């Protein structure tokens, strides 16, 4: 599945989860429900899988993404009033560490909030996009 279709489908899953569960559960409930919805559609993500962080040739630590499709997409799930900026920065760092280009930050707050993040800046409607078309 192409990445834009994949992210669109996962966002649809998030809205379904929010419609059923509403707001107020802990993050893990939404993460588990999102994984179930994704699995139903044949989108099989790794959940809470440890990923090593390297500095040059040295292992310096690890992080644990909520859900991820290796080499395709990292999904971070939150259950807060609004998405804090530091969570956006953290997702971009995860993308950089894994060399994955795309990430979704999904907040199951009073309403669903979705932020799509990229490892590298991708301006919308740039001159290059216009020339390629």
Predicted regions: what they are:
Residues 22, 45, 65-81, 94:
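Conserved catalytic cores of phosphodiester-cleaving nucleases, focusing on short active-site segments
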Residues 78-125, 129-130:
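Nucleic-acid nuclease catalytic cores
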Residues 39-57:
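A short acidic/basic microdomain associated with nuclease active sites
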Residues 2-9, 57-69:
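Accessory recognition modules or surfaces
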Residues 1-44, 112-113, 118-133:
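Solvent-exposed, charged helical/coil patches
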């Amino acid at each position: 599945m192409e990445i834009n279709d994949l992210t669109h489908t996962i966002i649809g899953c998030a809205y379904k989860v929010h419609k059923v569960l509403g707001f107020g559960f802990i993050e893990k409930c939404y993460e588990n429900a999102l994984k179930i919805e994704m699995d139903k559609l044949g989108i099989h993500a790794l959940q809470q899988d440890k990923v090593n962080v390297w500095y040059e040739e040295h292992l310096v630590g690890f992080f644990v993404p909520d859900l991820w499709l290796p080499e395709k997409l990292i999904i971070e799930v939150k259950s807060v009033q609004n998405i804090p900026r530091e969570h956006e920065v953290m997702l971009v760092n995860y993308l950089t560490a894994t060399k994955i280009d795309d990430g979704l930050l999904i907040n199951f707050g009073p309403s669903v909030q979705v932020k799509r993040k990229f490892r590298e800046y991708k301006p919308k409607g740039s001159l290059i996009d216009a020339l390629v078309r």
